[in-house]
Amino acid sequence: MTEDTIAALSTPPGEGGIAVIRVSGPDSQNKVKQIFRSSRTDGNFNNKKMYHGQIVSPETNRILDEVLVVFMNKPYTYTCEDVVEIHCHGGMVPVKEILQLLFSYGIRPAEPGEFTKRAFLNGRLDLTQAEGVMDLITSKTNNLKNVAINQLQGNLKQKIDRLRDDLVSVMANLEARIDFPDEDIDVEDYHELKHRIDNAKVDINNLIASYDKGKIIREGIKTVIVGRPNVGKSSLLNLLLGEERAIVTEIPGTTRDVLEEVINLKGIPLRIIDTAGIRESEDKVEQIGVKRTRDSMEQADIILVVIDSSQELSQEDKQILTMAQDKTSLLVLNKTDLHEKLDIDEIDKLVSQIPKVRISALKEEGLDKLEEHISELVFGGQVMQTEELVITKARHFHSLDKVKEALSSAEENIKAEMSEDLIAIDIKEAYDYLGEITGETASEELVDRIFNDFCIGK
């Protein structure tokens, strides 16, 4: 348990009906009682019951706000410490005054993520659950929310703990051999050890394989809209967004920079990037935009190539199609509300493997088909399910990869009939890397880095 008491605003700053100030630590309840004037006269407060009253400055007897206060006794609180929540009126002035009063009584401002960090240090949460808290708060799709809830409920922790228990059993077997070297070692025992390691590797590989899906859920799909100037790229972006965010004019080359927006497609965040039109230009600013477009195409997960179907295929169109042919791409034939002059056979000769969809961004026609095609490119047209265990964090992936390497090394040493000491070192290494994920063996630097990414008040 920590010895100091902290406080911070736990709800978003700004105007609102209610703001919640959280206070945690050994002096939280005593300090708040000194500034809280309750409607009750006896001064006794029951655990986890809400009380009406006023926050008053004892020195001036000035009322700062009318509030509701909840006193929560350790260890059954978020931080496992004594906690008080002050529900005051939303707005910067009352919140600021109440916090300043608390700080004047020796309570210090909470650091980013410190409430959740205390929950971790006091054993209420492991690191994966703590990360689940932040993902739940910042989730923009149902899929990420579901994954976050799974982590918060301890599903990943339980999986890692089971794997660590299995490795403890293997290490105990090896240590027994080391401690009693005179006993005969049956070859079958080595086979059994290898069998246990193989089973652990299957689980590790399944978790590693889930990262591709988890990364999509967390980071989204980088989708780049490309095409020559004035084919309707910005109109397409606005159609996907359902609102006008990009400039739409008849002037070619209007979009000279890269615009990025995020949409929710079947639970997957699609990071849509509208780029400058690709064409030869003497304009230095436009040239920079074109270069950024090429760079975006190189880094894209999906490329939407927009072609004006009311015009014949131009040399610039052909150049863009050639650039996109080796990428995961979708050909968007825009302006279908106009007479079609495009020769589809000519396109097929260039890039027959790129799927096509016809739309009219101006008339808002073809959006459903477009989304179906994008969905097909991303995950085979299926709605991504998140009930199964997936990892979404790069640090989890890298730790699991190290676990896999250590277990593979142990298998090689068993196969080569190396000493139990060497095999035990590999198993212990795998055990510790698993502990990094849950926080059991994580360094103080890693823990600080994780919680520094949190917001103040969380």
UniProtKB/Swiss-Prot annotation:
Pfam families: MMR_HSR1, MnmE_helical, TrmE_N. GTP binds at residues 230-235, 249-255, 274-277. GO terms for biological process: tRNA methylation; tRNA wobble uridine modification. Its main location: cytoplasm. Coiled coil: none annotated. Its EC number is 3.6.-.-. Binds 1 potassium ion per subunit. It is an enzyme of class 3 (hydrolase). It is found in: Cytoplasm. Belongs to the TRAFAC class TrmE-Era-EngA-EngB-Septin-like GTPase superfamily. TrmE GTPase family. This is tRNA modification GTPase MnmE. It comes from Natranaerobius thermophilus (strain ATCC BAA-1301 / DSM 18059 / JW/NM-WN-LF). The lineage of its organism: Bacteria, Bacillati, Bacillota, Clostridia, Natranaerobiales.
